Regions:
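Long, low-complexity, charged/polar intrinsically disordered regions in eukaryotic proteins
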Residues: 1-34
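Short, aromatic/basic amphipathic alpha-helical patches
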Residues: 143-147, 166-179, 220-221, 519-528, ...
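Glycine-rich phosphate-binding loop and adjoining beta1-alpha1-beta2 segment
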Residues: 152-188, 203
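Extended, hydrophobic interaction surfaces within ordered domains
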Residues: 42-93, 270-357
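Helix-biased "structured C-terminal domain" signature
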Residues: 104-107, 212, 311-661
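E1/E1-like adenylate-forming module used to activate ubiquitin-like modifiers
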Residues: 187, 191-194, 199-295
């Protein structure tokens, strides 16, 4: 392919290093290394390198050498360009950066060039930016030094009062900087917490550092910056950790910092500042001193440099950097928007119309989507793991779930189990999403929430107090399946009331002749192998849908309801097997939740007529609803969707409530 030599203006990247080797030349940069063969290759590169400064076209370079060498020169330069060591800067935008400044900040410019175009212009714009540095103490002093060294012409300092601030030390930093860049200055701005808009006035970017948990200020500052058309980024030190970021663009999500903080505290509710208030009374970490202060400041300065020069253009404000002040280790932590950080959205019944036609989400797809929910510090889930749990006869997985609004008393584990580790993980994820949705309530949505009548599909308003916090939540791969599961869960909530009014013993099932699902038959065989005695009593009569009580000599294991009798029996056998495994392995964490015991006087025996093990009839959704509404009312399915991300990830999490009137 012919190359227009006048459309190539080659410039050697600043990080390129060339070494003579026996085969020719070895060239290396941050892109990697390559061997260029040829006896004179090394000399050629050394000779032309000073001319590869972007000021001449390839045609002009070739014209400067004898005609016999022009083809070889063009071939070598194009080869270097193809491997990424030479860049075509023909389309780079013009700049007015002086040669002295370009030399002084050559490393900064080379770094920009590695990622994007027009590095001199981008650095020039960065240098002229109004970067406001807000905060206090040694961190603010170190940040001022970092900004001067990065090339900002006039950093603007806005000191707050919670920590002593040494202006003389900043003056020393400025004097050192002016030795190589005499144009640099320091400006000051008097501010206070009540007027954060003054901090951000006329700023290109606001950088805030707090050596203690100044959470309210950190929460409000991004909005003030956004209102002024400025980007923002922060460092907030809590305990022995500095939390850096997120970087929020001038048109970015001003709620991102609050979302990150709320997510963090949902997994660490004892964190100082979980109340969203400033805590100037807290002493800074003993490890925040010496070079550690400069390292933290440099992290923030570097984040601002990448943003203002366009290196990170297009990236979202979706992660924090955790800097451990004791070990100096860093880690990135992704987070999702927190519903209470976002603007309030009224409960809208119109959203319900889309549920029936929504695309199904099976267990495999749900587990894939849940990956975005996991982070050990800022995730909806802290981890998905098997720990050291016994994996026979059932596989067991655990998800540590965050407590998003403080209704659960802190993060809590949720378990899943099955016949394979894939199944146990998928079930654990589904159970975890249900439990998270059950405690994720946004009180700003009001006292009335909307759901759908299970039978008619009509929108119905219900009391929010009847829905949240949900004692039970259910889900399915689609809306009809979710409604069936929710109705069965609602029936399960009525078991205790049914026991309190029962006067006759419940029929005991003869398991030898019972019609079981294939999985249920396997569970029954496993219970026989481990020699776990158990009894099953049929509670279906008073509840109006298949419901069984499972008991062992150790007590009542579970009450299970479902519209399908075989499925209900299968689930109960599974929980009985899980209870055995938990007890045998001395691992109570994943044992089925405790339930009220089935009274001895309500435990019937197997009669001759029951010897066939006949199961109660399965019921339709209409029959199950009729059983739940014997005393009137209607069953309403209310989506537990107060977290918008959850509503997209798993749209079919629901609670069924009986509504009267």
């Amino acid at each position: 392919m012919e190359v227009d030599v006048e459309r190539v203006r080659p410039r050697l990247r600043g990080d390129v290093y060339v070494m003579r080797v026996q085969e020719g030349a070895y060239i290396r940069s941050n892109l990697g290394g390559a061997m260029l063969k040829g006896a004179s290759t090394y000399e050629w590169i050394q000779r032309i390198a000073p001319m590869l400064d972007g000021t001449r076209t390839l045609g002009e370079l070739c014209a400067a050498v004898p005609e016999s060498s022009r083809a070889a020169l063009a071939k070598l330069i194009l080869l270097l360009q193809g491997k990424g060591y030479v860049k075509n800067v023909l389309d780079d935008r013009p700049h007015t950066l002086t040669a002295d400044l370009a030399t002084t900040y050559a490393a900064n410019i080379a770094f920009i060039e590695y990622f994007t175009d027009s590095p001199e212009l981008r650095f020039e714009l960065y240098r002229g930016s109004t970067v406001v540095l807000a905060g206090s103490g040694p961190l603010l002093q170190a940040l001022a030094n970092s900004q001067l060294r990065a090339g900002v012409r006039t950093p603007v300092l806005a000191p707050f009062a919670e920590s002593p601030f040494d202006r003389d030390r900043v003056a020393e930093h400025l004097a050192v900087a002016q030795a190589q860049d005499p144009e640099q200055r320091i400006a000051y701005r008097d501010v206070e917490d009540r007027h954060l808009d003054r901090v951000a006035a006329d700023a290109t970017m606001v950088l805030h550092v707090a050596d203690r948990p100044m959470i309210e200020r950190a929460r409000l500052l991004p909005a003030a910056a956004g209102a002024a058309g400025a980007a923002s980024a922060q460092v907030v030190v809590v305990g022995d950790q500095a939390w850096i970021g997120p970087v929020i663009g001038k048109d970015g999500d001003a709620t991102a910092w609050e979302s990150a903080w709320r997510r963090l505290c949902a997994l660490a509710p004892d964190y100082v500042g979980a109340d969203l208030r400033d805590h100037p009374e807290v002493a800074p970490s003993e490890f925040l001193r010496g070079p550690t202060v400069a390292l933290v400041a440099n992290h923030l300065c570097f984040a601002a440099f990448r943003h203002l020069t366009g290196i990170d253009e297009g990236t979202g404000a979706d992660h924090l950097v955790r800097f451990d002040l004791e070990t100096l280790e860093t880690a990135n932590h992704a987070f999702l928007p927190h519903p209470l950080a976002l603007p309030a959205v009224p409960d809208d019944p119109a959203r319900l119309a889309a549920l029936a036609a929504a695309v199904p989400v099976d267990d495999e797809e749900l587990a894939r989507r849940a990956v975005d929910c996991v982070d050990p510090r800022t995730g909806v889930f802290a981890e998905i793991t098997e720990r050291d749990y016994e994996q026979l006869p059932l596989f067991v997985s655990e998800v540590m779930v965050s407590d998003p609004v403080g209704l659960a008393g802190g993060p809590f584990p949720v378990h899943g189990w099955g016949e394979s580790v894939v199944e146990s993980r998928q079930r654990a994820v589904r159970n975890a999403l249900e439990r998270y949705a059950a405690v994720m309530v946004d009180p700003r949505k009001g006292d009335r929430l909307h759901g759908l009548d299970v039978l008619t599909g009509e929108p119905v308003a219900v009391d929010a107090a009847a829905v949240f916090p949900a004692r039970t939540a259910a889900s399915g791969s689609d809306w009809p399946e979710a409604m069936r599961a929710a109705v069965a869960a609602a029936a399960g909530e009525m078991v205790v009331a049914a026991l309190s009014t029962a006067t006759e013993p419940f029929r005991r099932l003869a398991m030898d002749g019972a019609e079981l699902t294939p999985r249920g038959a396997r569970y029954l065989k496993l219970l026989e192998i481990v020699e776990q005695p158990f009894e099953v009593h049929d509670l279906s009569g008073p509840l109006g849908l298949p419901t069984f009580a499972f008991t062992t000599p150790k007590g009542t294991v579970a009450y299970v309801s479902d519209l399908d009798a075989g499925v209900a029996l299968e689930k109960g056998l599974e929980r009985t097997l899980l209870a055995y495994q938990s007890r045998a392995a001395n691992q109570p964490a994943y044992a089925p939740p405790s339930v009220p015991g089935l009274p001895a006087n309500l435990r019937g025996e197997i009669t001759e007529t029951d010897g066939t093990g006949a199961l109660p009839d399965s019921v339709s959704l209409e029959e199950a609803v009729a059983a739940l509404t014997r005393e009137g009312g209607r069953v309403v399915a209310v989506p537990l969707d107060h977290d918008p991300f959850l509503a997209r990830t798993c749209p079919f999490v629901v609670r069924a409530v009986v509504v009267h009137g």
